[in-house]
């Protein structure tokens, strides 16, 4: 596939880009189209047909809305930033070998790697859930605006991520508008999946380094209960992770092998 003009990791960190509700089934369909060996043009046409009656407004939906939805799906699974190609390829391989109910883990990882804004929103959601057991769209919008600026696009993107997480079953609406509680939670025990998810998160932080213990307790990974493993196990399970220590029990991970 051609990758000319793709965003580098540096540029995408300042961008928002996530301006639409993205349903889990749409990501699954997109990944399956890539796994089946379709070229970019065929995938684009297939997504146009697939989304024809699935966006709000049905056949009357504005073309721009569908185009933006497809652009998000393509950036995650079809044409990711060039530094995420290996991550994407490994993610597709893992999808083909793990149970369907665990696919959500891989879709989460690729989404946050392609859209660091998603991870920033998830971090504030996770923090609120830990502190008070609920999370508020308004509170997260205010926190994110402090980081990305007071822009309408920021508030809209936060809202769309909340709606997406609710669609994925990871948040549940309450009787109070804009207030959510935790939804589904997933235990991750497969070392391949853990290593891949750690790598995805390191891409959010421009390759690391990050302390291993901190990664396992990240609020931005709030839907997942990651089985603690050693840095050595992660490095062995990954083609691209590397580790170093600065003291007893202070292991750091970095994307440091051939990428």
Q: What are these model-derived regions, one by one?
A:
Residues 2-112, 123-124, 135:
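Eukaryotic partner-binding/assembly regions in large regulatory complexes
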Residues 42-48, 131-146, 206-219:
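Short acidic, hydrophobic short linear motifs in intrinsically disordered regions
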Residues 50, 67, 71-76, 158-168, ...:
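Basic amphipathic alpha-helical segments that dock to polyanions
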Residues 122-133, 137-185:
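Eukaryote-skewed repeat-based solenoidal scaffolds used as protein-protein interaction platforms
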Residues 174-254:
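Accessory, usually C-terminal, subdomains that scaffold auxiliary metal cofactors
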């Amino acid at each position: 596939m051609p990758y000319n003009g793709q965003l580098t990791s540096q540029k995408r960190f300042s961008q928002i880009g996530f301006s639409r509700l993205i349903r889990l089934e749409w990501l699954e369909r997109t990944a399956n189209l890539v796994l089946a060996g379709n070229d970019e043009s065929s995938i684009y046409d297939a997504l146009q047909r697939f989304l024809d009656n699935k966006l709000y407004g049905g056949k009357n939906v504005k073309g721009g809305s569908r185009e933006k939805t497809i652009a998000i799906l393509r950036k995650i699974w079809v044409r990711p930033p060039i530094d995420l190609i290996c991550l994407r390829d490994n993610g597709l391989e893992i999808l083909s070998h793990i149970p369907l109910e665990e696919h959500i883990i891989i879709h989460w990882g690729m989404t946050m790697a392609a859209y660091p804004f998603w991870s920033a929103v998830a971090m504030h959601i996770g923090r609120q859930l830990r502190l008070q057991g609920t999370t508020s769209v308004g509170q997260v919008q205010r926190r994110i605006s402090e980081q990305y600026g007071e822009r309408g696009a920021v508030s809209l993107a936060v809202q769309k991520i909340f709606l997406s997480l609710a669609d994925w079953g990871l948040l549940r609406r309450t009787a109070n508008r804009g207030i959510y509680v935790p939804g589904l939670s997933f235990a991750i025990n497969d070392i391949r999946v853990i290593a891949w998810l750690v790598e995805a998160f390191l891409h959010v932080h421009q390759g690391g380094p990050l302390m291993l213990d901190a990664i396992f307790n990240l609020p931005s990974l709030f839907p997942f209960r990651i089985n603690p493993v050693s840095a050595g196990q992660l490095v062995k399970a990954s083609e691209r992770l590397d580790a170093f220590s600065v003291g007893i029990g202070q292991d750091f991970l970095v994307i440091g092998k051939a990428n």
